[in-house]
């Protein structure tokens, strides 16, 4: 949001993508800034060695926290809604990843459509983000639409079943948007924990 507010084009990348795919994306879109964390430092350094265009690198966990408060500027609509706001790269299953350029108009139309036609988002509901935000579906349905109506988003520390359950306990989550494979992974994780104990296995059998 900070990037978009300042007129930047945002390119979310899957941190689990292969080094080759990340290198391809960076060489293709040629970003000026790359935000990551120290956890990915080894991969980033290996990728940077083969880049023709090297962006400025920012490790988010090394940025000094500024606790000072300042007035938040009200959101201003972009002067050119046709301007590219986000570039989403495909998974590259049929070749190299391809960048899909989405304008501000695309995003606004998507969010307004989802908010109006899928009447599940309200100000008092919390939405748990489960899917990665480098895909359009979770970007619009799990992040942008809830915030658009004044709702709350919740992010789990990881996809581990224990973290998910802990997140659900601590927050009043009303909506979880996912895909069948994701729910299957959650089910298998929970079932493995149930099967590991004779007591729980007896109770849930």
Located regions from the model:
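Conserved AMP-binding A3 loop
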Residues: 85-111
């Amino acid at each position: 949001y900070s990037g978009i507010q300042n007129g930047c084009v945002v390119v979310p990348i899957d941190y689990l993508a292969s080094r080759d795919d990340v290198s391809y994306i960076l060489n293709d879109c040629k970003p000026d800034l790359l935000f990551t964390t120290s956890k990915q430092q080894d991969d980033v350094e290996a990728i940077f060695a083969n880049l023709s265009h090297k962006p400025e690198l920012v490790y988010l966990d090394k940025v000094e926290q500024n606790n000072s408060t300042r007035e938040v500027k009200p959101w201003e609509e972009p002067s050119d809604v046709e301007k590219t706001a986000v570039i989403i790269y495909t998974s590259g299953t049929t070749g190299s990843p391809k960048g899909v350029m989405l304008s501000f108009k695309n995003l606004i139309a998507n969010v307004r459509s989802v908010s109006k036609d899928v009447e599940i988002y309200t100000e008092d509901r919390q939405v748990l983000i489960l899917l990665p935000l480098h895909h359009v579906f979770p970007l619009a349905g799990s992040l942008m639409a809830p915030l658009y109506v004044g709702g709350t988003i919740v992010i789990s520390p990881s996809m581990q079943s224990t973290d998910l359950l802990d997140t659900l306990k601590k927050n009043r989550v009303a909506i979880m948007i996912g895909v069948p494979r994701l729910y299957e992974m959650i089910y298998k994780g929970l079932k493995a924990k149930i099967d590991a104990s004779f007591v729980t296995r007896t109770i849930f059998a």
